[in-house]
Every structure is written in structure tokens, then in C-alpha cells.
């Protein structure tokens, strides 16, 4: 009886002890599991792919003294998002964001002399942006051997299999950031990224929410999704163009079929105009019903395989002009505003025995006016009475050539023998006599450059097995198609020399081959690169084909094949580079006959054009003016101010006022008003001015009232940007940085900013560029500081030993605060250099004087001074950048200013960054010491003999 309760108590105690032991064991297991999870998670995050989309290459190992401990958290911070680089092209540095969230630890670095303390940097680490190659662009293709005699002129990358050639759904650009991923638990982040990439691979055509790639939208009831396909899926709040919803897909007449192809659905959602969407629907349905593309085409060539005549180049053959020399019809297809370069090229190719037919792009009205003046000077020069808006890769270019051929054949007073197409970026590399002698010897031949690779690969690479449609100045990819049976498809370069017999055949023949090929190539990408080749190879004239277009093209695919045309073509393409002086030896080769070269661009390098011109025709007399100068118009009064942006209109007005102040201070004498002026109206014209291939500033032609006589005068002001790049003092031990600049419209191919002068406003998205010398791998820190010392962005860039250029566009919230910004570059947090750029306050909005509410909205900086989601405020004391309350208050008052107060603020900023170098009068002036523009060396009215066209010389030439 007594033993039983004791036994029960003992059992209860044992049970309690067992529970306690199990609890302790469970806690120990939980702790161990947590620590192991943290360790594996950190390892996984350190080795995982970067957020930002796309495949990321591993960074090259840096020297030990440059290595930095990377934070474990790979949050997709806005400061290191991977899609921002490039001058608007969306292909900037391959960025790897590491860190970026407040409170994340950052590895300490060894302190160096003069370095900022690393402890102060811990609360706000900089994201690391790894730039893998010299231009912030990583390519998986093997390096090419540069051959001076290579003339493979296809406009599509050689490694096209590795390139994403779709523009479906959200265009396949890397996302600037994925803020939702940064907030997810680390264990789910990789899974979400993997799922997102799989979805992108599967359904790039998922344009409509809830629709799979194979689902059908009923005709007549296709509303586009709320997000435009030209935008990212998650557009960051700093985005300038809100864009709104995609246009609703409406038709005048519903399509005659169900539009089910993902390419067509994507095109419908992205097309802007109702007419274009109607055309897309009709074209797709006709193709789907088998009514659009020919299935079989007749081959008329009697030869088996591909004919290729060999022609020999004999320098001695040009010593004797043939008895019946050929006469050439030059067809110049030009666009842009480089009228002086065009005139110089025209001067080099002109001969009274040839004919010149010029087509100017429908959008290039200034150039059209200049070309019309040229045509009035010479009877053998005519301008097409019709104009097309040709785009890269578009079917409109082939239409332009075919219509030009028809026009030339109908000109009975022009007895030409050869058709040669040129652009303003071409230049002859041999003389007219040499060209005529060669073509006279081979007058029955046709000269086209073939692709030189296997045909199946060429068809895939060129997209010939895809259906394209041009509308809204865009080439839309609508689906797949079959190559017609019965013919051999060929192609290569779209620059060619064709004899008259073949041009007549292509133009007037109604046989099965020509008729069906015109239909087939009306819906083809880059049709001029294949149409004439294919027709010639399958025609009765097939034995006249020479696999040489007599050109040298400067292909540098490492720089020129970055899919820079995806905003106008649903495909990936290339563009040749401009020639530089170091390329001159290529023009002297004699291995094969070549007579023209491209591309040349005077705003990039005019020296090479001069070298070639002097080589062909001799030097100009000593003392000839303007040989090292180049002027290019960017605005002309007949264009109308609607052709200008508010930023350029604002700054052009300020430049003109800067010139008038120079006239008053340097030309004015006390007691007289003869050199004092009051500005009147908008600028009349604006030119870029270059000297010795260096940008010298803008030339502003403007009207002003002379206060002494109250008469209107026309003046021209030269303004030059001040030097803003500055090496730190005392200089650091780091010597790789050569130059740094900020601007927009970065051209990664030519590695310069196309926005010459860096004219920026509050709604622009600037790009930071750095130029490097050779040296060891290093990591530098870049810091962007606004006019009131708010740190807008900071990030690190890994610079490889062979890097030459890097560029990055930080995703800043807009509007930017107007004023002078500073970009600092540090190495181990030791200042290396800095550069400045101006964000101009706008005096115009929609080309009208800005209203107070608009000014306050644009000029007060971003909401809550937050340029990014992350704050860098703690770096201000570390970088000795105090925020002055009085300066902030003055900025607030400036933001609310309008009228003369706003102009005064703007002009003070412009005067700090630009210098009025000189001013002149284009006509009569009451200012006795004012020089005449035509007598200066810098004015757009000064002599320019190299581009001026005069009377035909006795030898029939102009040059």
C-alpha cells in the first residue's frame, strides 16, 4: 500500500525528466539547424546569380590589394540595378548588385594614406557593379581575327544563335531593378528569380495578362494589357515616361481570322497607331490563310549551283581610258543633317559624264533643302520628287531602290550604264578614272557581295524564314514562314553595283521569279541585303554575278553588334564603325578591286576623310582656310521650334544672351549704346563646331535689337563648354583614370555621347562614362552629388585590366534638381578625380514660357529628396559634403521662380559652365568694332572650301 504511491511519484518524476531532456535536445537541434541554414544561405547567396535579369559572367579575379569583402545579402538595390547602362540603349554595364540595404555589414578594407575611415561606410554600403569588358558589355563570342581584306558585310551578328532576337512582351532588356525580390526571404529569392527566368524563356510573347502563348484572342475584341511592351514590367518610380496604357486594339474592320501567334499578339499590343494595328492584323490573317507568301518560284538560271565570275584588278589598266567609257548613275540615299560631309563626298565623286539621283529621308527636311540647292547648280543632279522614311532593316529601303531604278530608266536623257548606291557616310578610295576604266572592262557584270557562309545558317541569321511588316517606323515580327521552293536564296551586303540590263530586268520583268520575289521581300527584314542577290542568282543573268561589291566596310563586331536597333526592329542587328586615321592603310591594299569605303563621320573623325581626299586628289594650297574645321547644323529656322526640345530651346536662348553680354562687356564703350543689344525672338540656327576633331561648342545665330539705333541685327555667338574634369589634388597613386564625362545618348559603338555639349534638363537620365588606361584590375567608387550636396547615388565598379571605357546610368528618381552636379571617383575611398555637369532649369514647357506650377514641379528635385529608395545621407560627413540650410532654402526659392528671375538663375548657371568665346554680325551692324562673320575662322559663315561646290573644271570634275 505504501509502495504504490512512491512508485507513481517516481514514474511522474521520470516522465518530467524525459520531457525536459527531449525539450533540451529539440532546442539544441533547432539552434544547430538555424546556424547551418544561415551558413548555407549565405554561401548560396554569395554564389547565386545577380538580380537584374540575364546571365551574369563571373568577375575576373582582382589583385589581393583590390579585393573587397562582399556583403552576404544580394538585395536588388536600386543603386546597383543591372539595366541602366548605355546611352538610352538599355545595354549598359552587366551589373551585379551586392548589398544596398541599410544596416547590412560590409567588409573592412585596409586603410591607405588619406583614405576615408571604413567604419563610417558600414551603414550604407555601395552596390558593386562589375563591368566585365572594356565597354561594360559581356560577349560570349570568341574573338575575331581582324582581316584588312575582309568584306563580310552582313548587318546581323555572326553569333546570332546566342542572341535573343525577340522583342515580345516586356522587351528583353535587363530590368533596372526588382524591388520585390529585395524584400523576399533569401531562401525564396533564388527560387523566384529562377521561376522568372523560366517564364521569360517560355513565354516572351505573353503580352496579355492571363493569356498563354497558344491562346487565341477573338477577332475584333483584343484589348491590350495595361502595360506597354516598350516598357519594363516593373517600371521604377523614377521613370520619366509614364506612357500610360497600351493602346486598345481596335480595327476599322475586324481581322478575318483568330490572331493566335505570340509574335503577332505582341506586335498588336506594341503598335501605336490604329492604322498599323489594322495592317498587322490583315497581314497576319492573309499569311495564315496562305494568301500572302509564294510557295514555289521558277528558277530561270541555266547553271547548276552558284555562279561567280572572277575579276582581276590591274593598276596599269587605268592608264588608258577606254574608247567607250561607261556612265554611272549614282543613287545617294541620305538622311540626317551632315550636309557639309555630304557635299564633300559629292564633290569627290562628281564628274560631268555621270548622273546623280538623290533621295533624302522624309524626316530630314533641313538636308532636303540643302540638296535641292545643289541640284539647281548642276544639270546632271536630280532629287527624287517623292520621299520615304527609311529605317534600318526596313522594307522601305528596298522600295526606295526599286522606285529609283524605275525613275532612272524612265529618264531618257540620262544614258547610264551602271547603278551604284551610296550614302553620305561613304567616300571614294580610288579616282573616277580608275572606277570608269574598271567598269568599262567588266560592263556586263553585276557586283554584289555574298554572305560566304552556309545557306541554311544565313537564312536563319537573316530572319528570312520569319514574316516581318513595316509600319509606324518599326519592323514587326509576325511569325514564321517557309522559303519558296524551286530557288536558291542568297544574300550579303546591301551595297552593290548593277548594270543596266539587270536593272531593267528587275524593274520591268513580269516573270514568275521577279513578281514573286518582290512579294516575298515586301515582308522581309533587311530585304536589300538579299533581294538582288536572290533574283540575280536565279535569273537568266546569273552568269554575270561577281562576288565583290567593290567596297571596304569597317566592321568591328565587338563594338558594332550590340543589338542597338531593337527599338525599331524585332531582331538583332549590327552597324559598321567609323574609320579612323589608323585605318588608312586598308585603303591602299590591292589584293582585290575596291573603290568605295564606309563608314565615315566627320563629327567622329574628319582627319581620315582629309587624308583620303588628299591621297586621291592632292593637298589644297597652303593657307586654305577651314581644312581642320567642321560645322554641322542641329537647328534651322524653317524647321520650326517644335523640332526642338524644351531643354535645347532653353539653353539656346541662354547662349544667345551670354553672347550679348560679351558684346556689351568687351565691345561697348562708356557713353555709347552702339554695341548693346536686346534679344529678340527664337534662335535662327544652331551649329556644332569642331576644330581638329575636338568639339568646340555651339554657334547660335540669333536676332537682337541694337539699342543705339533701335534696328534689328542678326548675330552669331560662339559658346564653348568649360573644362569640368579635374584630377584630385594632391593626385592619388591611382593612375588608370584618363577622363570622365556625364551626358546622354551614349554611343557604345563609337564610344562618345551623341548629345554634344551634354545639354541636360530635370527629366533627363544621365549616363556616367569613364575612360581608362591599361593596368591591374581595380575597383573604384563613383558618387553622384546634387547641387545642394544630397548624395543621389553611389556604386562601385570593377575595372578589368584591359578595360578602355565603362559607362553606367544610375536609376535616379526624377526630376533632377537643377544646378551643377558633381560626380566623384574614388579608389579605396581616396579621391581620384571628379567631373561636373549642368542640369538646366527650363524656361520653356512645350515650347511656351513655363508656368509657375510647372516650374515648381520640375525644379524642386525628387519627392522627399529621394533619388533612390536607399539613402546615402550618412556619407555626407564622411565625404565632407555638408548640407547648408541656406543653400537648400535658396534652391527652394529658385524652384518657384519664373520670368526674368528664372532667366537670371539659368544664365548664372550657364555662365559658370560655358564661355562666350566670340560674337559676330552676319550682316550690317551699328557696332563699329563688331567683326563680320564671314571674316572669322570659327563662324558657320566663314569659308569652307573643302565642302563648297563651285563651277565644273575643264576635266569635268569639281575636286
Swiss-Prot record:
The chain crosses the membrane at residues 18-38. GO terms for cellular component: extracellular space; Golgi cis cisterna; Golgi membrane. It is found in: Golgi apparatus membrane; Secreted. Changing residue 574 to A: Strongly reduced enzyme activity. Changing residue 462 to A/W: No effect on enzyme activity. Catalyzes the first step in the biosynthesis of chondroitin sulfate and dermatan sulfate proteoglycans, such as DCN. Transfers D-xylose from UDP-D-xylose to specific serine residues of the core protein. Required for normal embryonic and postnatal skeleton development, especially of the long bones. Required for normal maturation of chondrocytes during bone development, and normal onset of ossification. This is Xylosyltransferase 1. It comes from Homo sapiens (Human). The lineage of its organism: Eukaryota, Metazoa, Chordata, Craniata, Vertebrata. The gene is XYLT1.
Amino acid at each position: 500500500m505504501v509502495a504504490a504511491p512512491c512508485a507513481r511519484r517516481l514514474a511522474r518524476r521520470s516522465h518530467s525528466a524525459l520531457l525536459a531532456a527531449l525539450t533540451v535536445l529539440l532546442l539544441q537541434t533547432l539552434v544547430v539547424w538555424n546556424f547551418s541554414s544561415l551558413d548555407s544561405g549565405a554561401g548560396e547567396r554569395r554564389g547565386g546569380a545577380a538580380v537584374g535579369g540575364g546571365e551574369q559572367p563571373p568577375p575576373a579575379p582582382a589583385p589581393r590589394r583590390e579585393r573587397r569583402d562582399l556583403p552576404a545579402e544580394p538585395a536588388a538595390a536600386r543603386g546597383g540595378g543591372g539595366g541602366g547602362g548605355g546611352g538610352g540603349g538599355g545595354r549598359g554595364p552587366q551589373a551585379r548588385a551586392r548589398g544596398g540595404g541599410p544596416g547590412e555589414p560590409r567588409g573592412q578594407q585596409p586603410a591607405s594614406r588619406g583614405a576615408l575611415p571604413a567604419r563610417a561606410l558600414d551603414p550604407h554600403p555601395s552596390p558593386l557593379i562589375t563591368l566585365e569588358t572594356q565597354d561594360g558589355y559581356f560577349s560570349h563570342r570568341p574573338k575575331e581575327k581582324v582581316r584588312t581584306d575582309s568584306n563580310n558585310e552582313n548587318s546581323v551578328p555572326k553569333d546570332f544563335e546566342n542572341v535573343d532576337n525577340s522583342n515580345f512582351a516586356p522587351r528583353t532588356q535587363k530590368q533596372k531593378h526588382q524591388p520585390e525580390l529585395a524584400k523576399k526571404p533569401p531562401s525564396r529569392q533564388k527560387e523566384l528569380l529562377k521561376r522568372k527566368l523560366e517564364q521569360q524563356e517560355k513565354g516572351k510573347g505573353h503580352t496579355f495578362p492571363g493569356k498563354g502563348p497558344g491562346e487565341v484572342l477573338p477577332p475584333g475584341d483584343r484589348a491590350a494589357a495595361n502595360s506597354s511592351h516598350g516598357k519594363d514590367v516593373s517600371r521604377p518610380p523614377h521613370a520619366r515616361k509614364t506612357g500610360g496604357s497600351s493602346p486598345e486594339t481596335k480595327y476599322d474592320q475586324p481581322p478575318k481570322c483568330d490572331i493566335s501567334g505570340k509574335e503577332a499578339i505582341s506586335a498588336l499590343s506594341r503598335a501605336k497607331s490604329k492604322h498599323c494595328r489594322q495592317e498587322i492584323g490583315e497581314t497576319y490573317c492573309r499569311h495564315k490563310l496562305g494568301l500572302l507568301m509564294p510557295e514555289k518560284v521558277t528558277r530561270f538560271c541555266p547553271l547548276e549551283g552558284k555562279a561567280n565570275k572572277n575579276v582581276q584588278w590591274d593598276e596599269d589598266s587605268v592608264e588608258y581610258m577606254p574608247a567607250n567609257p561607261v556612265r554611272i548613275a549614282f543613287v545617294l540615299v541620305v538622311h540626317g543633317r551632315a550636309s557639309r560631309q555630304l557635299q564633300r563626298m559629292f564633290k569627290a565623286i562628281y564628274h560631268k559624264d555621270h548622273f546623280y539621283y538623290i533621295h533624302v529621308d522624309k524626316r530630314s527636311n533641313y538636308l532636303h533643302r540643302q540638296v535641292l540647292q545643289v541640284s539647281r547648280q548642276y544639270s546632271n543632279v536630280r532629287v527624287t520628287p517623292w520621299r520615304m522614311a527609311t529605317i534600318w532593316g526596313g522594307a522601305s529601303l528596298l522600295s526606295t531602290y526599286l522606285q529609283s531604278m524605275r525613275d532612272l530608266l524612265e529618264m531618257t536623257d540620262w544614258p547610264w550604264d551602271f547603278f551604284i548606291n551610296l550614302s553620305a557616310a561613304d567616300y571614294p578610295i580610288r579616282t573616277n578614272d580608275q572606277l570608269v576604266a574598271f567598269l568599262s572592262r567588266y560592263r556586263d557584270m553585276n557586283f554584289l557581295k555574298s554572305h560566304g557562309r552556309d545557306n541554311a545558317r544565313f537564312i536563319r541569321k537573316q530572319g528570312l524564314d520569319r514574316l516581318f511588316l513595316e509600319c509606324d517606323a518599326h519592323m514587326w515580327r509576325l511569325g514564321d514562314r517557309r522559303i519558296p521552293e524551286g530557288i536558291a536564296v542568297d544574300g550579303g551586303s546591301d551595297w552593290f553595283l548593277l548594270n543596266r540590263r539587270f536593272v531593267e530586268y528587275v524593274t520591268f520583268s513580269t516573270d514568275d521569279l521577279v513578281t514573286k520575289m518582290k512579294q516575298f521581300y515586301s515582308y522581309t527584314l533587311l530585304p536589300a541585303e538579299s533581294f538582288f542577290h536572290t533574283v540575280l542568282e536565279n535569273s537568266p543573268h546569273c552568269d554575270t554575278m561577281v562576288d565583290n561589291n567593290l567596297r571596304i566596310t569597317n566592321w568591328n563586331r565587338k563594338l558594332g553588334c550590340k543589338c542597338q536597333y531593337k527599338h525599331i526592329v524585332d531582331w538583332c542587328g549590327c552597324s559598321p564603325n567609323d574609320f579612323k586615321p589608323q585605318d588608312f592603310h586598308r585603303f591602299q591594299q590591292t589584293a582585290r578591286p575596291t573603290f568605295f569605303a564606309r563608314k565615315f563621320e566627320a563629327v567622329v573623325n574628319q582627319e581620315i576623310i582629309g587624308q583620303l581626299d588628299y591621297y586621291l586628289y592632292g593637298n589644297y594650297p597652303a593657307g586654305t582656310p577651314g581644312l581642320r574645321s567642321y560645322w554641322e547644323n542641329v537647328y534651322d529656322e524653317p524647321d520650326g521650334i517644335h523640332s526642338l526640345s524644351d531643354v535645347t530651346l532653353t539653353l539656346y536662348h541662354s547662349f544667345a544672351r551670354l553672347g550679348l553680354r560679351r558684346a556689351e562687356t568687351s565691345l561697348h564703350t562708356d557713353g555709347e549704346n552702339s554695341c548693346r543689344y536686346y534679344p529678340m525672338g527664337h534662335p535662327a540656327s544652331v551649329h556644332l563646331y569642331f576644330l581638329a576633331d575636338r568639339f568646340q561648342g555651339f554657334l547660335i545665330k540669333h536676332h537682337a535689337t541694337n539699342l543705339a539705333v533701335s534696328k534689328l541685327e542678326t548675330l552669331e555667338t560662339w559658346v564653348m563648354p568649360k573644362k569640368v574634369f579635374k584630377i584630385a589634388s594632391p593626385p592619388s597613386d591611382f593612375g588608370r583614370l584618363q577622363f570622365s564625362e556625364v551626358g546622354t545618348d551614349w554611343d557604345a559603338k563609337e564610344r562618345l555621347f551623341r548629345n554634344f555639349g551634354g545639354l541636360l534638363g530635370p527629366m533627363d537620365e544621365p549616363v556616367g562614362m569613364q575612360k581608362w588606361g591599361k593596368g591591374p584590375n581595380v575597383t573604384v567608387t563613383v558618387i553622384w552629388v546634387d547641387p545642394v550636396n544630397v548624395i543621389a547615388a553611389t556604386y562601385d565598379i570593377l575595372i578589368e585590366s584591359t578595360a578602355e571605357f565603362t559607362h553606367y546610368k544610375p536609376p535616379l528618381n526624377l526630376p533632377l534638381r537643377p544646378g551643377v552636379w558633381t560626380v566623384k571617383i574614388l579608389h579605396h575611398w581616396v579621391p581620384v578625380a571628379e567631373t561636373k555637369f549642368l542640369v538646366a532649369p527650363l524656361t520653356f514647357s512645350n515650347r511656351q514660357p513655363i508656368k509657375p506650377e510647372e516650374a515648381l514641379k520640375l525644379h524642386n528635385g525628387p519627392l522627399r529628396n529621394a533619388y533612390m529608395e536607399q539613402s546615402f545621407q550618412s556619407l555626407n560627413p564622411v565625404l565632407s559634403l555638408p548640407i547648408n540650410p541656406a543653400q537648400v532654402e535658396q534652391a527652394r526659392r529658385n524652384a518657384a521662380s519664373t520670368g526674368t528671375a528664372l532667366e537670371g538663375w539659368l544664365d548664372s548657371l550657364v555662365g559658370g559652365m560655358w564661355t562666350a568665346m566670340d560674337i559676330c554680325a552676319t550682316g550690317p551692324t551699328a557696332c563699329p568694332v563688331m567683326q563680320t562673320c564671314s571674316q572669322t575662322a570659327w563662324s558657320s559663315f566663314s569659308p569652307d572650301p573643302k565642302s563648297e561646290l563651285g563651277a565644273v573644271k575643264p576635266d569635268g570634275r569639281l575636286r
